Amino acid sequence: MMPQLTDDFLLLCGDVIIDVNFNRFIAFHKAHKAWASLISHPNGHPYDSSLLVTEIMSPKEVGGMPEDTHRVIRWMNKEDERLYYKNRVNAGVEIISPELLKETMKNFTPRHPENPNKIDLDRDVLKPNIKSGKIYAYDTPEYVKDMGTPDRFHEAETDMLKGLVYARNLKNKQKAIFLDRDGTINKLAGFVTNPEQFE
C-alpha cells in the first residue's frame, strides 16, 4: 500500500466542502503523535454517517470536569446498532501517517478476495487500528459539509454564496454566547445591586 509514502499526508474526500484552519489541524496531529487525525464535526445526517466515540477521562482521573482526550475508542458505521451516540462524524478529511499504512499491511486480510487490492479506508485501515490508541478526532466548529447528495450540494452552494463557508474559519473572529452553570442568559446591565435589575 503506497510504499513510496514517507511523510504524513493530508487526505480529502472529493465530496466535502471545507474551510478550516489547517495549521491548527496539523499542530493537533503533531502534538498527539497520531497515526491518523480525523476532522470530526456534528452534521445534519448522523444516521447515514460514520460516528466516532472518543475516550473521556473521568473527573477522578483529571481532578475536575470530565476531559475528552480526543482518542478514538470506537467507530460506528451507519449500519451498526446505535442506542445512544454523540453526533461526532468523521468528515472525510484526515492527516495520515505512513506508520498507519505499514501497520495495516502487517495483518491485512482482503474483505473482497476477488479483488484483493480493493481497500476501504474507513473499514480496512482506520477502524481496525483504533486499538493502537493512535487515531484521534479533531473537533472543529468550522465549515465542513458532505455534499454527496443533490440536497446537500444545494445547501453547500447556498452557504458559499452567503459567505458562511469562509466566515466559520477560525482565523476569523467568531461570535460566542457564554452561559453560566444553570444556563441563564442575562442582559449586560453594568453593576447589578439587586435582583430586580436583572433582564
Spans of model-derived segments:
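Catalytic-core segments of class I nucleotidyltransferases/pyrophosphorylases
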Residues: 6-10, 17, 23-30, 41-46, ...
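Short acidic donor-binding/metal-coordinating loop in glycosyltransferase active sites
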Residues: 13-14, 181
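Extracellular disulfide-bonded cysteine-rich modules/repeats
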Residues: 50-53
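Short, small/polar residue-rich loop motifs at catalytic or cofactor-binding pockets
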Residues: 171-174
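Alpha-helical substrate-recognition element adjacent to the catalytic core
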Residues: 176-199
